[in-house]
A protein has these predicted regions:
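Cytoplasmic juxtamembrane interface segments
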Residues: 181-192, 276-287, 363-377
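Membrane-interface segments at the starts/ends of alpha-helical transmembrane spans
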Residues: 239-251, 289-291, 328-346
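Alpha-helical transmembrane segments and their helix-start/interface "positive-inside/aromatic belt" motifs
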Residues: 244-255, 288-307, 378-383
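Soluble extramembrane regions of membrane proteins in the secretory/endomembrane system
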Residues: 1-245
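Membrane-helix interface motif
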Residues: 225, 229, 235, 269-275, ...
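Alpha-helical transmembrane segments of integral membrane proteins
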Residues: 300-384
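Juxtamembrane interface at the cytosolic side of transmembrane helices
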Residues: 257-303
């Protein structure tokens, strides 16, 4: 993109508790096709700061609203400000819906075109309500996984809950831009309704995948690429099934596996250096094999500990809401601000304490009498 040949701009917003790397695949594919792409960390996620608002999705789009305003005000002379879009998955999809509503209201108030020309909503339909859709002045594509495990929250129940052909959420999205005489009772998936020129274009997709796999699915990615090709026109047109993002994921996986494999060889290499020679120790003698009683105790402790871990998680979630009330209500606070991680922290601390108690009791009641040497635990530290 250059100032002489401006390109459409697309903001990408990841889902809940995700950093920008989670949607790098769609960023790669959109940028290959010549769009200007900004992949952000939502507020309070990744490297982004927190928001003072407890309604960061509605009022700020998790940071997307400010970005759209910044771009629209001419911060980048190579961006076509008449072609600004947003896309996101899950919580990021909600941000896209909220963006269509926010900038739509702004356009109505100022009697202007919406700054957010088009949005693509992936994996989220809970806020596709009349009070939000009615003010939208953006083209809108909706993609929802047919086997989305969160569909139980939708308006329909059972198997129909994720069926976007008959879902009230998708019907409202489409019928809201159609004349009363042309309104439909069943959505034709992949069909474009409305008018691009009037910013009322609508399309619904319903890919047969699970919610977390939707951003990593060739069909879902292709549908999104086709949508932006339809509303903006790609500066560098490429077939939507010509995708390379999976190579990045494959090599990232290989990199992770190799990093784990290399831990022991690299540790041995460092231990061969003179600087680390003082920490080398002889391999201790193996412990005696467990007898029948020892095996019973071992497996009993294993299953009891696992059971305690299972049944204590939900209570720890409830306790976290009480101990960290500000964080639980999304208020910005210095006192343990990560509301989702606070529950895990309490659960881990409680089960760690239970584990220490069980471990100590098993040693005192059984291990000590059967030749278990505490030195074999590797907990002792000698002064240099």
């Amino acid at each position: 993109a250059k100032s002489e040949s401006k390109a459409p701009f697309i903001a990408i917003i990841p889902g809940f508790q995700r950093s920008k790397e989670a949607l790098s695949n769609i960023a790669i594919e959109l940028s290959r096709r010549g769009y200007v792409v900004a992949l952000i960390d939502p507020y309070a996620q990744g490297l982004s700061s927190s928001s003072l608002s407890t309604r960061a999705a509605t009022t700020q789009g998790y940071g997307m609203f400010a970005l759209v305003e910044h771009v629209y005000d001419g911060a980048f002379n190579f961006v076509d400000i008449d072609k600004i879009g947003a896309t996101g998955h899950s919580m990021g999809g909600n941000a896209a819906i909220r963006g269509a509503d926010f900038f739509g209201k702004q356009a109505i108030q100022n009697n202007t075109k919406s700054k957010l020309d088009s949005v693509y909503v992936s994996g989220y339909v809970l806020t596709l309500r009349n009070n939000i859709l009615r003010d939208s002045k953006s083209n809108m594509g909706v993609s929802y996984a047919l086997y989305d495990e969160g569909a139980f929250r939708n308006e329909l129940t059972a198997w129909d809950s994720a069926n976007m052909m008959i879902a009230p959420e998708s019907l409202r999205t489409v019928n809201g831009v159609l004349p009363k005489a042309e309104q439909i009772k069943k959505v034709e998936l992949g069909k474009y309704y409305g008018s691009k020129e009037k910013n009322s274009l609508r399309v619904i997709f319903n890919e047969p995948v699970l919610h977390p796999f939707q951003p990593y699915n060739f069909e879902a990615t292709s549908n999104q690429l086709d949508y932006f090709e339809k509303v903006f026109g790609a500066p560098n047109p490429i077939n939507s099934y010509n995708q390379i993002w999976h190579w990045k994921e494959i090599f990232t996986l290989i990199n992770m596996v190799l990093a784990l494999i290399m831990l022991i060889p690299i540790a041995r290499l460092f231990l061969g250096l003179r600087f680390f020679s003082s920490i080398k120790k002889d391999v201790p003698a193996p412990l005696n094999a467990l007898n029948k009683k020892g095996k019973i105790i071992f497996w009993s402790i294993f299953f009891i500990s696992a059971l305690i871990a299972c049944v204590t998680f939900i209570p720890m979630v409830e306790i976290a809401k009480i101990l960290f009330a500000d964080a639980a209500s999304r208020k910005l606070t210095w006192f343990f601000p990560q509301r989702m991680n606070n529950s895990v922290m309490l659960w881990a601390a409680f089960n760690g304490l239970v584990g220490i108690i069980i471990f100590s009791l098993s040693y005192k009641l059984f291990g000590k009498k059967n030749g278990v040497d505490p030195k074999s635990w590797g907990l002792g530290i000698n002064r240099m």
